[in-house]
């Protein structure tokens, strides 16, 4: 508990007690010794380890999913042996470990740094792939049906970032072993981005913002052709033009829709809730 200074009769504070002076002297002395390095420091057991041993310990922790421990060794390896194959391998694995440890921003920064420093590395394609995985907010639909969340309602920024990274991978390295999975994820992401635009168009339609609904629907049709959400986008155009009392544009939109979707359920069911496009069961 902090002591309260005693006020003398003339209004002056009384001098601090002797015990308090001793504490202040000891604290100052301890700080001085620490600053001069006279006190024993904690011994780093890894101080004389080779790059190979540091990497072996890091990889062992990595394989056990002990991301924090792995990162500790990777950081020591990079700081002591910044050049060579061990350092480069550590940089790649550290990016993955940071992602799995929950630090997506640092993981993305690691990927960008590696790509910038080692553009001709034989495994640089993996770093583009990892960038796509870090920002990929989906599961290719394999287990998505277990969740009731509508993917189209999610913030599309990370999906767009993931798509851009994966597209760069398949463009730069079409023969990469990661390219097939990257392409499958890109297909999923395009469908999700399209569904998001249609979700926004439906939102505007329900709230009477018909021109905004038309703009969103048209954008989805032009930007994401051949995606499942375009059927609904086409129907939204028909409804919005009808609400705006534009019969010619409505009939033209309906004609195009009947040409592309002759058996659409929207003709009889309207905009009723339906299963998400990724929900197969």
Language model region names:
Residues 4-6, 32-281:
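Acidic, polar-rich low-complexity tracts and alpha-helical solenoid repeat scaffolds
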Residues 24-34:
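Bacterial N-terminal signal peptides
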Residues 3-25:
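Bacterial N-terminal signal peptides that target proteins for export
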């Amino acid at each position: 508990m902090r002591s309260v200074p005693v006020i003398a009769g003339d209004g002056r504070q009384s001098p601090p007690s002797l015990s308090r002076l001793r504490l202040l002297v000891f604290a100052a002395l301890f700080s001085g010794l620490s600053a001069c390095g006279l006190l024993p420091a904690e011994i780093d057991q890894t101080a004389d380890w080779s790059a190979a041993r540091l990497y072996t310990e890091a990889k062992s922790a990595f394989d056990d999913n002990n991301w924090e421990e792995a990162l500790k060794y990777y950081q020591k390896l990079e700081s002591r042996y910044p050049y060579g194959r061990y350092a480069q391998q550590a940089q790649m694995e550290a990016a993955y470990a940071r992602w799995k440890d929950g630090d997506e921003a640092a993981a993305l920064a690691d990927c960008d740094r590696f790509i910038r420093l080692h553009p001709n590395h034989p495994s640089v394609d993996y770093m583009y792939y990892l960038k796509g995985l870090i920002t990929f907010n989906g599961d290719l639909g394999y287990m998505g049906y277990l969740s009731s969340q509508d993917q189209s309602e999610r913030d599309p920024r990370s999906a767009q970032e993931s798509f851009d990274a994966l597209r760069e991978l398949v463009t730069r390295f079409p023969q990469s072993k990661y390219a097939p999975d990257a392409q499958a994820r890109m297909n999923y992401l395009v469908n999700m981005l399209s569904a998001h635009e249609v979700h926004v168009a439906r939102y505007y339609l329900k709230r009477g913002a018909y021109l905004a609904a038309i703009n969103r629907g048209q954008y989805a049709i032009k930007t994401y052709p051949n995606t499942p959400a375009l059927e609904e986008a086409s129907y939204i155009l028909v409804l919005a033009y009808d609400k705006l009392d534009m019969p010619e544009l409505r009939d033209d939109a309906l004609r195009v829709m009947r040409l592309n979707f002759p058996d659409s359920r929207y003709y009889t069911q309207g905009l009723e809730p339906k299963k998400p496009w990724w929900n197969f069961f």
